[in-house]
Amino acid sequence: MRRCAWPLLRLSSRVGLALRHGGAVRLRQAAASSSSSSSGGGGLRAPDTSLFVPVPLKPVEGAAEEDVGAELTRPLDKGEVLKNLNKFYKRKEIQRLGTENGLDARLFHQAFISFRKYIMESSSVSADLHIILNDICCGAGHVDDLFPFFLRHAKQIFPMLDCMDDLRKISDLRLPPNWYPEARAIQRKIIFHAGPTNSGKTYHAIQRFLSAKSGIYCGPLKLLAHEIFQKSNAANVPCDLVTGEERVYASEDAKQASHIACTIEMCSTNTPYEVAVIDEIQMIRDPARGWAWTRALLGLCAEEIHVCGEGAAIDLVTELMYTTGEEVEVRNYKRLTPLTVLDYALESLDNLQPGDCIVCFSKNDIYSVSRQIEARGLECAVIYGSLPPGTKLEQAKKFNDPNDPCKILVATDAIGMGLNLCIKRIIFNSIVKPTVNEKGEKEIDSITTSQALQIAGRAGRFGSSFKQGEVTAMHRDDLLQLKEILSEAVPPVKAAGLHPTPEQIEMFAYHLPDATLSNLIDIFVSLSQVDGLYFVCNIDDFKFLADMIQHIPLNLRSRYVFCTAPLNRKEPFVCTTLLKFARQFSRNEPLTFDWLCRHTKWPLAPPKNIKELVHLEAVHDVFDLYLWLSYRFMDMFPDAALVRDIQKKLDDIIQIGVCNITKLIRASQSGAAPGAAEVMSEGFPLSRTKRDARTVSDHRDAKSAEPLSIALEVPGERRAKSLRTYRSATRQEDLKSHGRGSLANRLLREGLLTQEMLRQLESEWQDQHRSGRYGLASKRNDQSSSKEMGKKKK
């Protein structure tokens, strides 16, 4: 220990001498040997130090070994030590030197607090530090001599300071093409099939896929991958299906076929193919999943890559391929059937026709519209995002069947891709929907031109019974805005998504072994550098799961896999199940079929209300989660085949519920299910934004009391007008669908309210909304009248 003390003693004396006689300029040279790296390189942005979490450093308790410093000098006077430490902290030269060594004001303060606490609470300190502190207290040294010890302590609690250059190199995302050496080793031919929905662009790419000796199809949805899987095998081209949850072999002996249809996240960048097809390439800009399209485009090892999607992505794909030295051939396609935007809105559900599809952007609207259609004696199919793929296909089959009495479809934008539907007319119930901005915050905004065209293009599909498609809106005011949206050019795709790889996170963890996975990701994104062609995808879902399972002891690779699980974090039951999966996994206890059945209470009965239907959908997601994990940890999730069997049975149960959805809605709204109102409010009207801090229950209470008055800050006159229109329409629908709910019925039964009074209340409610008062004007009138009365009394 004594031999180790002298180098720092000599260095500290040089530091003190430099500060006292040469200032900060000479001090930089003196301290150079104590700093292995600096936090900021030339021209690099400063890291976000608020993400740097200090590593706890416990004070030395008890004399584990003899106190050499006290033997060489004398015991320290802690009072004098504290005074001199505070002097050290206030020295401007020390603060400036800390900045040059990567300690900004925040880190400097945190490091000093930890340094002072360590010295004051330790029963003994290292011999070299003890000698320096003793010299300072005796007047033989200067407080500046503490800087090397302070910097050493700072690097112990902030280990990233000592490896900032390495961390910057690891998180440098400016050359993604270099991540795929196998693809760079061959000269690939890129063919871009550009065109609108229903133009045949994907058909031509698939024909080349089928004629190739080997090929891979990469799609955004399991439904699309399954469709290509079936088409390929039907054409006598053996094709395997690979999704996150399963692998289906074309041959009975489970031998890998030369063709593969997969979801895009599952494509291999190491296997060589003759032809690759990347579908819906415009999703390369998606804030959450865009990285998967970037990875496929840059990394697929195929002689020919056929890219299908909107023409808005042509320029970006061309620029990306320029960086790889590959040229892009563009083939443009036009729509095969005409699509007409009608000059009149639907205005009433009484005007529905066979082949109509009403598009809603919330579950609440789905439920409301479905019940109103049923009240008119019509049957309707229902499709929304959280339904299992099998149920979606069954509902689509029911709607497409010319012999089925179901001629109306009520759906969300989930119909935009993945389903073949015989739709004559698309009717937008609204033109606003929830969106996620660049910061990961949810906002309410008008649908984009790309979204509107994707949905509208489902009408009049080529080969269906309707030779042309029609598009309109539910409300007259929305139709004007819809026409404007559809007439605008789709803005070009400007950047491609990127996501840190497991290898990059592992290298980060090597340098920062005490950091949490969530903190590692934050620091990675903070230090990452991307050029103008790329952006880092939103990682909020990943961080949410990382924080949720942080307390469970898992190795980094397993923890990373659990955090990439595809689940909806808004579903508490699914999140809780993932937590239980991770906990049992950490104990090295296999998650068996029996365990899963006990957890999900299988077997399950058909739903009696909406709340039970939503729970069944969550259970289906849990089965998906089990299958997804079984694909990655086969030994720990051994019963995938059994789970897949009961998942098919659950599909049938959910299908029964969806077929009777109007009965479930009635049961929920009549109060048959406790808590059903909360489920119904899941898709609350879109006038609620992230700026409205009220809870769902507050929203429900407000609906029963008075109309909502929520100020929306949406840029643009068109958006503001469309939001006002939608809010008005939503309230009218709420009046029709909820106004005669349990409270109204009770008042009618008790004789406190008549039908005429109820109609008058509805009329007054709508009039109040149109005037924009919502009780505010009456309140002001009451205040002014009370003042006048007060004056008269005086």
From Swiss-Prot:
Main location: nucleus
Catalytic activities: ATP + H2O = ADP + phosphate + H(+)
GO terms for MF: 3'-5' RNA helicase activity; ATP binding; ATP hydrolysis activity; DNA binding; DNA helicase activity; double-stranded RNA binding; RNA helicase activity
InterPro entries, per the entry: DEXQc_SUV3, Helicase_C-like, P-loop_NTPase, RNA-DNA_Helicase, SUV3_C, Suv3_C_1, Suv3_DEXQc, Suv3_N
Residues that hold ATP according to the record: G195, P196, T197, N198, S199, G200, K201, T202
Disordered as annotated region, ranges: 678-741, 764-794
The organism's place on the tree of life at top rank: Eukaryota
Enzyme class label: hydrolase
Keyword vocabulary terms for this entry: ATP-binding, Helicase, Hydrolase, Mitochondrion, Mitochondrion nucleoid, Nucleotide-binding, Nucleus, Transit peptide
EC number: 3.6.4.13
Ranges of Basic and acidic residues composition bias in the record: 689-704
Any GO BP annotation: negative regulation of apoptotic process
Boundaries of every Helicase C-terminal domain copy: 341-506
PANTHER family: ATP-DEPENDENT RNA AND DNA HELICASE, ATP-DEPENDENT RNA HELICASE SUPV3L1, MITOCHONDRIAL-RELATED
Function: Major helicase player in mitochondrial RNA metabolism. Component of the mitochondrial degradosome (mtEXO) complex, that degrades 3' overhang double-stranded RNA with a 3'-to-5' directionality in an ATP-dependent manner. ATPase and ATP-dependent multisubstrate helicase, able to unwind double-stranded (ds) DNA and RNA, and RNA/DNA heteroduplexes in the 5'-to-3' direction. Plays a role in the RNA surveillance system in mitochondria; regulates the stability of mature mRNAs, the removal of aberrantly formed mRNAs and the rapid degradation of non coding processing intermediates.
Protein name: ATP-dependent RNA helicase SUPV3L1, mitochondrial
Naturally occurring in which organism (per UniProt): Gallus gallus
Lineage summary: Eukaryota, Metazoa, Chordata, Craniata, Vertebrata
Gene: SUPV3L1
